[in-house]
């Protein structure tokens, strides 16, 4: 077994109050450069998980829509537990700023303006058949109804 301490394994998942954005950590590289890893938690851990089609579609939608709103996003990867995403950025945003961005992006996803899943073709997606725009829109509406907090442990809805 590894002796490396993985931050997400030390987080008490029974204490957090989703949906929220929190800073996991900021790291400086050995040759310079700094990245920040965020926890974008969309559903309450161990209570609800987003099915793969909806989560996969949110991933594709976030990829472009979030980058349209802010600079420095390196990656947004879904958690294996399907409750949210890691968000990796070159820019060290505070959690309130990112929570506001994701609120705006989820509002776009929930709207009638989004009618297709970007890059959901065999050439551009490794599992192109596993998408559900309907599910992504329903999750966006549910998350917005609950409100996105800028704090993982106390509700500070943006």
UniProtKB/Swiss-Prot annotation:
Catalytic activity: S-(5-deoxy-D-ribos-5-yl)-L-homocysteine = (S)-4,5-dihydroxypentane-2,3-dione + L-homocysteine
Lipoprotein listed as a keyword: no
Cofactor note: Binds 1 Fe cation per subunit.
Positions annotated to bind Fe cation: 56, 60, 125
Top class in the EC scheme: lyase
Pfam families found in the cross-reference section: LuxS
Cofactor: Fe cation
UniProt keyword Lyase present: yes
Coiled-coil segments: none
Keywords from the named record: Autoinducer synthesis, Iron, Lyase, Metal-binding, Quorum sensing
Enzyme Commission number: 4.4.1.21
Signal peptide region: none
GO molecular function annotations of the record: iron ion binding; S-ribosylhomocysteine lyase activity
Family in the record: Belongs to the LuxS family.
UniProt cross-references to HAMAP family, sorted A to Z: LuxS
Protein task: Involved in the synthesis of autoinducer 2 (AI-2) which is secreted by bacteria and is used to communicate both the cell density and the metabolic potential of the environment. The regulation of gene expression in response to changes in cell density is called quorum sensing. Catalyzes the transformation of S-ribosylhomocysteine (RHC) to homocysteine (HC) and 4,5-dihydroxy-2,3-pentadione (DPD).
Oligomer and partners: Homodimer.
Protein name, as recorded: S-ribosylhomocysteine lyase
């Amino acid at each position: 077994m590894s002796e490396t301490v993985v931050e997400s394994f030390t987080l008490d998942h029974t204490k957090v109050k989703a949906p929220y954005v929190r800073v996991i950590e900021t790291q400086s590289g050995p040759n310079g450069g700094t990245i920040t890893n965020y926890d974008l938690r969309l559903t309450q851990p161990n209570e609800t998980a987003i099915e793969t089609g909806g989560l996969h579609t949110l991933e594709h939608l976030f990829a472009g829509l979030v980058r349209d709103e802010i600079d420095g996003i390196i990656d947004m990867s879904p958690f294996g537990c399907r409750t949210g995403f890691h968000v990796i950025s070159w820019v060290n945003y505070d959690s309130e700023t990112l929570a506001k961005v994701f609120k705006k992006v989820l509002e776009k996803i929930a709207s009638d303006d989004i009618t297709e899943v970007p890059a959901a073709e065999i050439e551009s997606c490794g599992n192109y058949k596993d998408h559900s725009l309907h599910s992504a829109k329903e999750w966006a509406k549910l998350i917005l109804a609950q409100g996105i907090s800028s704090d993982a442990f106390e509700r500070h809805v943006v």
